[in-house]
């Protein structure tokens, strides 16, 4: 029988190397910790120099406050920090770092040299370590005010960790992504990156709104900026601002999603769920939304100390945060209209509430053009850049693109269109399109129908192509949703109630949310500590698997405090009804019918995509048409 192992203290060197496994995974992890220290030091410019993807060399130089000579050795000790003093400080921490273990972990697995000088010091001082096998040596050095940290030969003393590193290009891509994330978090700081002697990018300080937009374009691509909707909303102490990509600018991977909480980038499942819900009706299956969003909240109501790499946070009132994020993004996306997507470059949309669904002009089956008798006011609030300052300072630099107060009625639009094409009196010159773009509807006037599928229209920008079935499907779908919301859900009692075996926690959750289930057409009754009975279901969902649906909804309520599964099932059914009720391919439409459909699209929420996330229309500008025919060359 083998001897029982005895408990003993680990050596400081081994303890640091084990701790490094949590903090230092690859060169990108080192860059993150060093850059966060530079930002916490009040830097206004940070230079990063990399060799071999950061494996051979990673040097970060800043112009921050610097570190006093006496504190340099202490900076490399574990759990030594200048950012917090007591537990209460942790509850309101705003610095990116606060644990005091990053430099100790890095210096235990690499050759580290740190040089620093404060503003009141006559000279700089330098400290060197080499894998914790040597005591830190402090000596005078030449350096301007600020700090430089040089990390060489990462994992030189831990071969097992080094062999898990990927190719140089892969490691550099990860490192570059870290710098981009921080560059978006701090518009007021300049970032410069060099790799193997070559300048990769130089991002200058961005103080005003236009400069911030340029940085977003430099980091995320100009295409994102051109297809993004700027938003800013503040309510009940919660402030959300940034850019959300239009549904037509989706990605196959979630690689263009940046979300910051008080300046700290996080990947939180609560946030991901809220964003996914907001885009639910407009994204094609398997596609991912794009966004750069900044969420600001009182530090006392968010816990950032829940993950070793601080990528996750915990909100005190997660339900309120979830509903605020979902509601803001859902309204912003719902208020996008064709004229937002056709607005002049540099303009942002300040959208007003407008009628939707049944309130929109109806596209009649026989070419009738009429307005609904009752107008349902949209509850959406104004979404757009306000004139106030944002988190990074400065005021809005965007000019407002203002829509007409109300779209013309369909009868007026049809009359104007008929007059435009009416035979001219003898000797009268041909009519020209209005000189002002504001006199032409965003989707223009119909010219013809192609193959019984597409509508060709002319607007101020050029040619518009519309998938008439997809467009009418979205219009019908939105009307059905409005009708369901106004009339409520009718419940259907079950002749034989269905019983469900659940855990006691799940039963408590169902009982707590019984009124919520009731509003959605369900009636649940608790039979015992671990059993429920379904006595009523929504009439529209009589074909659904009620037992599994209730289980899934309860799981969501326990996880997120809310659930959209019932609504998703209802929307799926309404989508099917809309698809069958929409105008079919190969149906010949008259010009008034086509124009009625275009006007409906202009005042219907989410009309840019059908119920399945496919685009309903596209624009071919005159420049694009000229290129096709080699004009102007």
Curated annotation (Swiss-Prot):
Disulfide-linked positions: none
Entry keywords, A to Z: DNA damage, DNA repair
InterPro entries: DNA_mismatch_repair_CS, DNA_mismatch_repair_MutL, DNA_mismatch_S5_2-like, HATPase_C_sf, MutL/Mlh/PMS, MutL/Mlh/Pms-like, MutL_C, MutL_C_dimsub
Gene Ontology terms: biological process: mismatch repair
Gene Ontology CC terms: mismatch repair complex
PROSITE patterns membership: DNA_MISMATCH_REPAIR_1
Oxidoreductase listed as a keyword: no
Gly residues composition bias: residue spans: 385-396
Region (Disordered): 337-364, 383-405
Pfam families: DNA_mis_repair, HATPase_c_3, MutL_C
Entry GO MF terms: ATP binding; ATP hydrolysis activity; ATP-dependent DNA damage sensor activity; mismatched DNA binding
Role according to the record: This protein is involved in the repair of mismatches in DNA. It is required for dam-dependent methyl-directed DNA mismatch repair. May act as a 'molecular matchmaker', a protein that promotes the formation of a stable complex between two or more DNA-binding proteins in an ATP-dependent manner without itself being part of a final effector complex.
Family label: Belongs to the DNA mismatch repair MutL/HexB family.
Protein name: DNA mismatch repair protein MutL
């Amino acid at each position: 029988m083998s001897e029982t192992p005895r408990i003993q203290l680990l050596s400081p060197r081994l303890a640091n190397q084990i701790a490094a496994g949590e903090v230092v995974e690859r060169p990108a992890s080192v860059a993150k910790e060093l850059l966060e220290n530079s930002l916490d030091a009040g830097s206004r410019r940070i230079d990063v120099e990399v060799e071999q993807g950061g494996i051979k060399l990673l040097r970060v130089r800043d112009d921050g406050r610097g570190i006093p000579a006496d504190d340099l050795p202490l900076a490399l000790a574990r759990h030594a920090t200048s950012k917090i003093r007591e537990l209460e400080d942790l509850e309101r921490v705003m610095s990116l770092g606060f644990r005091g273990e990053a430099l100790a972990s890095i210096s235990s697995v690499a050759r580290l040299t740190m040089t620093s000088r404060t503003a009141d010091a006559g000279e700089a001082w330098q400290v060197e370590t080499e894998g914790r096998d040597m005591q830190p040596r402090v000596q005078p050095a030449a350096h301007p005010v600020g700090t430089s940290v040089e990390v060489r030969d990462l994992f030189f003393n831990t071969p097992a960790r080094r062999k898990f590193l990927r190719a140089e290009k892969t490691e550099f891509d990860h490192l570059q992504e870290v710098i981009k994330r921080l560059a978006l978090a701090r518009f007021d700081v300049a970032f410069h990156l060099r790799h193997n002697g070559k300048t990769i990018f130089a991002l200058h300080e961005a103080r005003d709104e236009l400069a911030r937009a340029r940085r977003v374009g430099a980091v995320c691509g100009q295409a994102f900026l051109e297809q993004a909707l700027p938003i800013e909303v503040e309510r009940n102490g919660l402030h959300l601002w940034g850019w959300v990509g239009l549904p037509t600018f989706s990605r196959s991977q979630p690689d263009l999603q940046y979300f910051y909480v008080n300046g700290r980038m996080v990947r939180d499942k609560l946030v991901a769920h809220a964003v996914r819900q907001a885009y639910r009706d407009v994204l094609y299956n398997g596609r991912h939304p794009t966004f750069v969003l900044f969420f600001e909240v009182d530090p006392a109501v968010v816990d950032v100390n829940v993950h070793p790499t601080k990528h996750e946070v915990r909100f005190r009132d997660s339900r309120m945060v979830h509903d605020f994020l979902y509601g803001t993004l859902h309204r912003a996306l719902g208020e996008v209209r064709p004229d937002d997507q056709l607005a002049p470059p540099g303009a942002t949309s300040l959208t007003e509430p407008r009628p939707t669904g049944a309130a929109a002009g109806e596209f009649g089956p026989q070419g009738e053009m009429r307005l609904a008798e009752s107008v349902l006011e949209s509850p959406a609030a104004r979404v757009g850049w306000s004139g106030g300052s944002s988190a990074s300072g400065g005021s809005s630099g965007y000019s407002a693109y203002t829509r007409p107060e109300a779209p013309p009625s369909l009868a007026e639009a049809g009359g104007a269109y008929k007059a435009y094409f009416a035979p001219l009196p003898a000797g009268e010159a041909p009519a020209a399109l209005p000189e002002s773009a504001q006199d032409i509807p965003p989707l223009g006037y119909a010219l013809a129908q192609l193959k019984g599928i597409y509508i060709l229209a002319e607007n101020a920008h050029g040619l518009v192509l519309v998938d008439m079935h997809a467009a009418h499907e979205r219009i019908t779908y939105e009307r059905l949703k409005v009708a369901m919301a106004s009339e409520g859900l009718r419940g259907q009692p079950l002749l034989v109630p269905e019983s469900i075996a659940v855990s006691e926690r799940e039963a408590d959750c169902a009982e707590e949310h019984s009124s919520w289930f009731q509003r959605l057409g369900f009636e649940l009754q608790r039979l015992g500590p671990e059993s429920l009975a379904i006595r009523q279901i929504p009439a529209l969902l009589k074909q659904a698997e009620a037992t599994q649906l209730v289980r899934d909804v309860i799981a969501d309520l326990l996880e997120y405090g809310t659930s959209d599964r019932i609504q998703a099932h209802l929307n799926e059914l309404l989508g099917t009804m809309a698809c069958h009720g929409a105008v079919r391919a190969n149906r010949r439409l008259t010009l008034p019918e086509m124009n009625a459909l275009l006007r409906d699209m202009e005042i219907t929420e989410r009309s840019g995509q059908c119920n399945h996330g496919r685009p309903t229309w596209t624009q071919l500008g005159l420049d694009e048409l000229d290129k096709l025919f080699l004009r102007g060359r």
